[in-house]
């Protein structure tokens, strides 16, 4: 809500001074403070965890220099911008849902650039892009008896039937995604618990519910940590 309120105030001020909005770009996000980063994702859950898991599921669109750009779900986290944020340094942003909707809501149809984006620390989008490629943020598939299955067994379900050229599950996931088995993306997936032999142990029905549980547990805001709004 902070981004909407500040945008509305700024736009009204421009209109009151007989100005015209020709370009509007807004980037925001809730993040852990830089001096309290405590996990490889450099992120903590400070709002609805389901919304974090399902971010980008409906794709995104925006307008840039008069051209409408449509980003399908599987490419949202691959379509990023680098931002130099004062006091934080280089951050990344990905497109946030339907920016064209806000062009109408804010009342500047004459603008030829309207972009709303979500800010994350560098590396988030690259990792989540591969989580999406695996298919784990899915709330349409109902899987029986998930409670008694392991996290590794759930991940295994999303691999091709041919086993992705053999090896253990980590190697097969890396082969399937065409990424390094020893790189940072795999390290983050491992840390999150996607290859764990531990039972899921909750009354989940969908992969998305399992992912929501995982990030709720692993990406908690510590008692001694601080979050911030950018």
List PLM regions with ranges:
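C-terminal catalytic/substrate-binding lobe primarily of soluble NAD(P)-dependent oxidoreductases
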Residues: 13-230
